[in-house]
């Protein structure tokens, strides 16, 4: 099994698709990496030669991937929260950040409903 950026990519899939299993590589970036490395995107991972795998590793080195990318995204959110801007406060309160309504909807961000006892009439 080929190991790229610390991830075992699936053997039976085409290289173009298998690279997307690495966090930070989507289909567009996968095609770019394969073009830079000069590897045919239609071959299966199990059919890659060792030199092809080395080329792919070299081509992925120039991108921020996996743990480094997750850390970078986390630090960006933490920075927003630390400076106290609106976006940071909304992240901290687990509310939608981009101006969506919250009186109804926003269930994914706010979590499941908290039942409130009704008033007596």
Swiss-Prot record:
Belongs to the universal ribosomal protein uS13 family. Residues 91-121 are annotated as: Disordered. The keyword rRNA-binding applies. The lineage of its organism: Bacteria, Bacillati, Cyanobacteriota, Cyanophyceae, Synechococcales. One of its GO terms (cellular component) is cytosol. It comes from Prochlorococcus marinus (strain MIT 9312). Coiled coil: none annotated. Keywords: Ribonucleoprotein, Ribosomal protein, RNA-binding, rRNA-binding, tRNA-binding. InterPro entries: Rbsml_uS13_C, Ribosomal_uS13, Ribosomal_uS13-like_H2TH, Ribosomal_uS13_bac-type, Ribosomal_uS13_CS. GO terms for molecular function: rRNA binding; structural constituent of ribosome; tRNA binding. This is Small ribosomal subunit protein uS13.
């Amino acid at each position: 099994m080929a190991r790229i950026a610390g991830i075992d990519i699936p053997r039976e899939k085409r290289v173009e698709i298998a690279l997307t299993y690495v966090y930070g590589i989507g289909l567009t970036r996968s095609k770019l990496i394969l073009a830079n490395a000069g590897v045919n995107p239609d071959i299966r991972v199990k059919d890659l030669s060792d030199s092809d795998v080395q080329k792919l590793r070299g081509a992925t080195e120039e991108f921020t991937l996996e743990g480094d990318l997750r850390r970078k995204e986390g630090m960006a959110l933490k920075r927003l929260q630390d400076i106290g801007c609106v976006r940071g406060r909304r992240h901290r309160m687990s509310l939608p950040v981009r101006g969506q309504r919250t009186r109804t909807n926003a269930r994914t961000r706010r979590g499941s409903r908290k039942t409130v006892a009704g008033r007596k009439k």
